[in-house]
Amino acid sequence: MAPKNKFTKEEMVEAALRVVREKGMEGLSAKSMASALGTSTQPDFTAFGSMAGIKQAVYDAAVRVYDSYTEKGLREQIPFFGVGIQYIRFAREEPALYRLLFLTQKQVPSYGAMDAMLHLQERVRPTLVQIYRITPEEADVYFRDLWLVVHSLATLIVTGDCPYSDREIGSILTGFSLSICKAIKEVPGFAAGTFDPDAVFRALVGK
């Protein structure tokens, strides 16, 4: 039997990540990894325990790639808007990894699309409170609602069905941002969900 090639864990994870970017997690196998590593022999998975172990390592690597995008957004002058733009950029530039993390059944019980949203919500809450002069509870509602729009746009991008340019997406996000902020500021009980939507709409259409 031919000896198995020796590669570092980092080299194997990078090779596996290349496979996933091209073929998705379902395309990851010993054969596809060998091809990505440029060898004709099966890689030695001892360091990972099994193929399941390397799949977990690839998932963790995908999370790190995603985190690098959101960290850039958090360093922008307006962090919560920067995070939204970077989230969409991640979907556009890393569609396979976006699909793995956010459009498939959870690989890790504590990490999925909603978990990612809650983590970012916590990070941007202080900035929202400071800039918009709203309460932490109102800031959470604002970010949640805007994030749902961002996630929808990102999903359209990944599925190849988004007709909007980056400029148009920026305008869409600005419009929703303004609408949500105005509702929080001017509709009593909006953030708490205790307002009367029928009364609010009647007042709006009656103007």
Residue locations for each model-derived region?
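Helix-turn-helix
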Residues: E11, A15, V19-G53, A57
